Amino acid sequence: MTEEQNELNELKIAPDQTYKEFYPVSPPFSYVGIQVDDATGKKIYNAIEPTMSTEELNILKSIKDSIILNVGVPLAVLKNEKLMKDYLDQMIKKILKKNLKTVPKESVDKLNYYLIRDFLGYGKIDILFHDPNIEDISCNGTNTPLYIWHRTHESLPTNIIFPTREELNFIVTRLVYKTGNQISIANPILEGTLPEGYRAHITLDEVSKRGDTFTIRKFRTNPFTVVDLIQLGTISPKLAAYTWLLVEHSRSMMVSGAVASGKTSLLNAITMFIKPEMKVVSIEEVRELRLHENWIPLTTRPSYQPGIQEVTLFDLLKSALRQRPDYIIVGEVRGEEAYTLFQSIAVGHGGMCSIHADSEDSVIKRLITRPMDIPMMMLPLMNCLIQVKRVALGDHFGRRVESVTEITEIDKESNEPVLETRFKWNAASDTFEYFKSNNEKSVFGLISRINQIPIETLHNELERREVILKWMVDVGVKNYDDVANIIRNYYHAPDDVYNVARLGFR
């Protein structure tokens, strides 16, 4: 049996199959069915693609062989998806004409689908790349189902399996090539970015004994806006308005949470509040953030060869400080770069970052111990800690900001940071409680002192911005650019935007 027939059998679904959910991915060719075992309740993610007749499989193999043997394909064609699609279409016509075959248009369309999938895409896992409901793709080796993380159904096994090491190695080689990096027996672990912006982590069977493995972290093409997060219940309008005020006045914030808790999505949404004219430098290992035009995105570079210098987060942060940024954003702090970030905040730069930690106490412990080693007296430089977590919401899961805490000072007697809770999520009612403060050591007190703005004026401004954010939710302003434009307009004509929102105009 040919490889194509084996693959076809793996993807073929029984005609009497019933699904909990069924939706198109790339119609009319690929679909997804979420199957549920009635006995165990176990869910399976079924990737469904067109079935091929024996004749179609033979033609497909013939075309693939011809393309592989044809070493004269111009490099410009190989690098251009549109030109490559045209080239594949011509190859199909050429093979059919050569063999004097008349094939229905439906068959030609299927041949095109599989050729584009296998030569330009990612082979049998290509459907997973195109499904917008998938957040993560995990392959744990040979002869075991690929697992995905579905936005609705969470962790699911799929009906996609790599039965041989050769087949898995072929896909891994494709992934490595698309990252533009190198992997070898000497360096069997790779972190890279795919052309779509997705993060890929790959290990060879030198270190993963079940065979090569890969994990792909997908990111939304259109990132969540602050309005999206309000609608999802991750934050409240008042909480969003609070972060807006802090961003405007160049206060520092740290978003903390466990893996897949929504840290990056929240951090990216908050950055929308940065004034367009402000210069921003972001520093990440893999580029995930999206900001306005006056933005320099920096990413680390690992070294795989002697003579090629590794570029770390610490190196990039030192470089960023020489570029006179108004705001520095570090995708995730985990080492010595944390100390440099705190130093940059101390000299007046706005700063934002994320950190892996499951509570405020864990954040403090991570910051003051190796390898970050932040002196206790410097902790209040990070004005605000935002703790986000993944929570159960009835029969599904979501993300919620569990708390917003201000580090106001260091207690002189205990030498411990003094924390003030500003927002707290109530799990029973799924609402956010706001704790107003006129304390001069609070963040509003700090803004008041530095900018000579009465604290009550800041509280009033908080209410105004809450009205605007509620209005955006009510009228359905969700597009990233539309949300950004309203925020930009508010900076230039605050009364005009507020009055439109207050009166509820659409």
Q: Which role does the model predict for each range below?
A:
Residues M1-I183, L503-R506:
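N-terminal accessory targeting/assembly segments
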Residues T51-M52, N143-T144, T152-E154, T164, ...:
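Conserved nucleotide-binding/hydrolysis micro-motifs of P-loop NTPases
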Residues C139-S252:
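P-loop NTP-binding catalytic core
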Residues Y242-S256, S265, A269-V391:
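Switch/coupling sub-region of P-loop NTPases
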Residues G262:
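Conserved glycine(s) of the Walker
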Residues C384-K470:
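Conserved P-loop NTPase
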Residues R464-R506:
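Terminal-proximal interaction/regulatory segments of ATP-powered molecular machines
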